[in-house]
Structures are given as structure tokens and as C-alpha cells.
Amino acid sequence: MQNSAQDYLQQMLDMVRQSGHVAIKYLNKSAPAFKKDFSVITKADKEISKLCRGALSKTLKDPAHLLLDEEDPHMASYLDQRRLEKTSFLWALDPIDGTRLYANRMPLFGISLGLLRELKPWLGVVYFPILKELFYCDGQDAYFVQNAFGSNQKRIKIRPIQEKLSGKSLFFCNDTFYNKFAWRDKDFHIMINACAVVNLCWPAIGRGVGCFLKCSLWDFAGSWPIMRKAGLDLRSMKTGQVMDQVHADLFNRTSKPWELKEYQLISSQKHYSQIKSKIFEIPTRNIYS
């Protein structure tokens, strides 16, 4: 018999809770190293990946389920539309999002786990162990939990926020933003956190008005259904088209498999045009000339 949304959600919550313990355990002895693409990997990344893969081992015996794990060396082989269309449930795990921050013992890192159904965002869980903050979507509603997994935890339902853009508003960008873009900051300002799940989850509760990124599926899969319940969507910077499901053609296949091809602007429909007007592409420069 197929599990219910609540069954899957409880499993996901258990996984991120245990993963949080692992992240805290290795925070001061993370043994950071570099991957081939020069991104950082730590002992916690490896241990959390192993933990979650073990927790899902029985589920993954069903060919209807597929796990996309940032630390899986075979992940590129899954980027095939015909295979994806045969996958009813696509799990996407980022063991430590904000790994560079984690490796420097900073608290802004999270554990992200998303479950897509028929390639559309469905369930999502994002946990910030040091902050003791949890965001999750149960398929119907999304919630923000303070003092998560504690006896005094406080759960708040996430709803669309009707905030007017002003001088106090913050818009989040990734750490490579200024390599290609500039920002007209007359009305409101940008902030760079170097952590995708911070950029995606915080605006869902009014900490910022949106974000700009080009990342991999595991970076945003957990946050995706959560932010949609807050009225925020992934929109193409080029066309403004909303991304509402996964398709292989949206992602790079070679240098960085599963990274989005296009930059995305995450915001409410109301704010999209105003925020986009603040971003402009700068001419490519040869830094050696």
C-alpha cells in the first residue's frame, strides 16, 4: 500500500532531525575538503548523505522512487527526461546547504529534503539545526517552527505576505551575483548570505522579499513547496515564466549536472517586475586585459 503524505512527511522530519544531530556533532571537526568543481564538502555532508540513503533504502527499492543526492557520484545519469517521467516520486537531498559557512562554523546552514510527486513540488522540509528553526510543507499547507523538535516548539502557518517594497526591504542574491549583474539600490537593498535555503525560506516568513539564484535541484527542492505557499515562485529572469515542475531541459547536463540553465528570480507576482527592474547585466570584462 502506498504511503500517505503524512507518512512521508514524518519520515522526512525524522531524517532531518537526526541529520541535525550529525551536523552539530561535526561542526567543530568538519574536515572540509574540495570536490572536483572546487566546492566544499565536509564529513557532515558525507555522514548525512549516508544516513538519509539508509533511511530511504526500503523506499528506494520501489522503481517509482528516485533519490537525487548532491553527494551521489551517479547523479548526472538521472538527468534523462524519459527516466524522470517514469519516476512518480523524486527525492532531492542537500545534506548541508551553505557548506562553506558550515565549514567556517557559522550558523547559517541548513539541511534540505524535498519530495516531488509527478515531477511537481509536493513535500518539503528544511531544518536549521543551530537556529533550531524548521520550515516544512505537508502538501496542503506550510509551516515555520521555532525551537524545532523541542518541548516548547512553536508552529506558525505560512501565508502570503503583502509587504510593500520600501527602504527597509531586503532582496537576497547568491555569492556570484556581481560577477555578471549589478543592482540599482535606490529604493531597497540586497544581501548575500551564501546559503540557498536561507535565501529561499526566509522570504516565506517576511525576512526579505525574495531572492535571485541559479542553483541545483537539491538546493531548492525542499524549499520549493514551502515558498509557493507564501505566494513566491521561481520565475525565469529572461521570460518571467513560472517554473512549476521539473523537466530535464531546464538543467545543465555537462559541467554542473542538475544546475539550472537560467537565472531565477524568486518573488511574488506583485513584486516581480519592480525587483527585476533593479537588476541589470553588466558587459563581460576580461580581467586580464
Outline where the language-model segments fall.
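Active-site-adjacent structural elements in enzyme catalytic cores
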Residues: 68, 74-141, 148
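Short, well-ordered coil/turn elements that cap or connect secondary structure elements
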Residues: 62, 184-187, 229
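N-terminal subdomain of lithium-sensitive/metallo-dependent phosphomonoesterases centered on the IMPase/IPPase/PAP
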Residues: 1-96, 284-289
